Structures are given as structure tokens and as C-alpha cells.
């Protein structure tokens, strides 16, 4: 696992032509897709293989015992994002309770906020479909994200 969280909580995203609409700005639905992809990339950079978290990966002998469905998502658009823009993306994970967490995604262009996205996940048993504790790997990722971060009392 990587100790320096800036390598797995601060990412970049180049806006591609296919991400834009006829007006040349990011199509609204792209933001939540980028949020989920950034979370996946963050897990990989941290050292977690996709097979440990996501079902249906190539070469996976069995699916994870715990699924992490999205139960809530939200996006705020602050400024237009155009094709060719190079965005900085900052992730801030937060455990909400023993079975859920949320990731806040902050998108910046030249140090200015252009969008924010939030995705909330709940851990459920793939067998019973009932809430369960977060998988150990996700717990480690959440704990590591707190290192060096000052939080309010």
C-alpha cells in the first residue's frame, strides 16, 4: 500500500471530445462516470486490485463476498468544462458508518473549482443482500486517506 496519499487521492483527467455535447462543453452525465472511474483508479494506485473489490473481472475465480452498490450520488456544476481541459481531481473519502462510505470528488481547472461530485456506497453481502461491514481492503483505503488530514473535532 502506498503511504503518500497524494499519489492516489489527487488525480488528473483530460476532457475528451466524446465527453462533450454539441455546445462543446462536458455533458452532465460524464461527471458521475468520472467520479466512479477516479475512485477505481484511486484504489488501484493505492494497491488494491480490481478483482478484490469489483465482480466480473477477468481471471476472477470468485466474486467478492461483499458488494458496494452506489446508493446515492450528486453533482454540482460550477463552471463550464470544455474538450481539451486538463482537470485536477481531488478525492476525499469519508466513512459514514461501519457499512457505508462516501467519496467527495473535487474537479479543478487552473486551481478553480469547476465541479463537485459525491458518490455514496453501502456494503452488502452478495449472498444475503443485507448490509454488512465494509471489506477490510476498503477499510484500509479509508483509514489511509485520513493520514495527514486535519479534521474538525
Curated annotation (Swiss-Prot):
GO terms for biological process: phylloquinone biosynthetic process. It is an enzyme of class 3 (hydrolase). SUPFAM superfamilies: Thioesterase/thiol ester dehydrase-isomerase. Its EC number is 3.1.2.28. Keywords: Hydrolase. The active site is at residue 21. The keyword Cell inner membrane does not apply. Belongs to the 4-hydroxybenzoyl-CoA thioesterase family. DHNA-CoA hydrolase subfamily. It catalyses: 1,4-dihydroxy-2-naphthoyl-CoA + H2O = 1,4-dihydroxy-2-naphthoate + CoA + H(+). This is 1,4-dihydroxy-2-naphthoyl-CoA hydrolase. Catalyzes the hydrolysis of 1,4-dihydroxy-2-naphthoyl-CoA (DHNA-CoA) to 1,4-dihydroxy-2-naphthoate (DHNA), a reaction involved in phylloquinone (vitamin K1) biosynthesis. InterPro entries: 4-hydroxybenzoyl-CoA_TE, DHNA_CoA_hydrolase, HotDog_dom_sf. Pathway: Cofactor biosynthesis; phylloquinone biosynthesis; Quinol/quinone metabolism; 1,4-dihydroxy-2-naphthoate biosynthesis; 1,4-dihydroxy-2-naphthoate from chorismate: step 7/7. PANTHER family: 4-HYDROXYBENZOYL-COA THIOESTERASE FAMILY MEMBER, ACYL-COA THIOESTER HYDROLASE YBGC. CDD domains: 4HBT (cd00586).
Amino acid at each position: 500500500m502506498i503511504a503518500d496519499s497524494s499519489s492516489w487521492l489527487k488525480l488528473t483527467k483530460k476532457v475528451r471530445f466524446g465527453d462533450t455535447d454539441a455546445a462543446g462543453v462536458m455533458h452532465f452525465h460524464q461527471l458521475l462516470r468520472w467520479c466512479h472511474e477516479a475512485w477505481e483508479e484511486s484504489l488501484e494506485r493505492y494497491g488494491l486490485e480490481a478483482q478484490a473489490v469489483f465482480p466480473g473481472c477477468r481471471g476472477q475465480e470468485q466474486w467478492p463476498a461483499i458488494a458496494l452498490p452506489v446508493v446515492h450520488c450528486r453533482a454540482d456544476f460550477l463552471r463550464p468544462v470544455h474538450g481539451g481541459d486538463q482537470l485536477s481531481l481531488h478525492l476525499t473519502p469519508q466513512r459514514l458508518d461501519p457499512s457505508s462510505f462516501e467519496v467527495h470528488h473535487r474537479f479543478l481547472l487552473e486551481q478553480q473549482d469547476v465541479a463537485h461530485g459525491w458518490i455514496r456506497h453501502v456494503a452488502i453481502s452478495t449472498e444475503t443482500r443485507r448490509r454488512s461491514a465494509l471489506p477490510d481492503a476498503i477499510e484500509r483505503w479509508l483509514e489511509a486517506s485520513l493520514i495527514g488530514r486535519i479534521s474538525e473535532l
